[in-house]
A protein has these predicted regions:
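Transmembrane-helix boundary and interhelical-loop signature of multi-pass inner-membrane proteins
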Residues: 19-33, 49-55, 147, 151-195, ...
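Juxtamembrane boundary at the C-terminal end of a transmembrane helix
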Residues: 225-240
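Hydrophobic core segments of alpha-helical transmembrane domains in multi-pass membrane transport
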Residues: 9-22, 41-50, 63-72, 113, ...
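Structural signature of hydrophobic alpha-helical transmembrane segments
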Residues: 1-15, 58, 62, 126-137, ...
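Helix-loop-helix junctions within the multi-pass membrane cores of secondary transporters/permeases
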Residues: 100-175
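Hydrophobic transmembrane alpha-helices of multi-pass solute/ion transporters
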Residues: 29, 44-58, 85-94, 238-240
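Glycine/small-residue-rich loop that forms an oxyanion/phosphate-binding "nest" at active or ligand-binding sites
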Residues: 59-102
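Cytoplasmic-side transmembrane-helix entry/capping segments in multi-pass membrane proteins
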Residues: 30-40, 61, 85, 156-165, ...
Length: 240
């Protein structure tokens, strides 16, 4: 288990917000768009390389299918967007500029809620691998720099929220890690990496995958692994 990713991510948000305050006139859209696409390609590479850790592609396929179905039925992606809309409607700007609350809530929502934060924290807690959270840190740094040019210093405060959320998820993942077999960890890494690859594709503008709807797959992977390890299942499998 490693908290490095959560700490660096929090500091990156603070640094990004500070950079944004220095460039109140705004960062040229051409520059920010090009940088974000480049980071998206890096995210895509991390996702693809991590997917090769798979122990049982069949378990991952079943988990992704069940997870996608559950996520679509629950409309997780839609719920996240509705939450964002609700926040925008209830956090108002002061006269003459944005409030600290607006910058804090908006940046916290955008940086804390997402497959990359969840999967990165799980990876840091279970395998001690911070690569996803460190990549997310670079993305958040650039994103918060752009956000701070319009929402002000409140964006920097989101670093605390991100540390609490990602830190808690990392500690939780570290606590359950001893309960997971090596095969379960490998398949969980594979499923999570597929979600990270989807985020990378979205960030480049190539696709518009509702990645949040696939998050339940991360719960189905260890569940299916546990089921297939039961003696009853192994007896059934032996018949075939």
């Amino acid at each position: 288990m490693s908290m490095t990713g959560a700490i660096v991510n929090a500091l990156a948000i603070v640094a990004g917000g500070a950079v944004g305050l220095l460039f109140q006139r705004g960062i040229p859209e051409r520059v920010s768009k090009t940088v974000m696409i480049g980071l998206g390609l890096c995210v895509l590479y991390i996702g693809i390389s991590g997917a090769f850790a798979c122990q049982s592609i069949l378990i991952v396929i079943v988990a992704m299918t069940l997870g996608a179905a559950a996520g679509a039925l629950l409309n997780i992606d839609g719920a996240i967007h509705r939450l964002g809309t609700w926040v925008e409607a209830h956090v108002h700007r002061h006269e003459g500029g944005p409030s600290l609350a607006e910058g804090f809530v908006t940046a916290s929502l955008l940086c804390c809620v997402g497959a990359m934060a969840v999967n990165g924290s799980l990876d840091a807690g279970i395998r001690g691998d911070n690569s996803i959270l460190l990549t997310k840190s670079m993305i958040d740094l650039v994103f918060c720099a752009m956000l701070a040019t319009t929402l002000g210093a409140g964006v920097m405060l989101a670093g605390a929220a991100v540390f609490v959320v990602e830190g808690a998820l990392t500690l939780l993942a570290g606590a359950i890690a001893p309960l997971l077999s090596e095969a379960a960890v490998a398949d969980l890494t594979c499923a999570g990496s597929l979600l990270v690859a989807a985020i990378g594709l979205n960030q480049t503008g190539a696709t518009k995958i509702k990645v949040a709807d696939y998050l339940p797959a991360l719960l189905f992977v260890p569940l299916i692994r546990w089921l297939v390890s039961l003696p009853a299942w192994q007896q059934i499998a032996a018949w075939f």
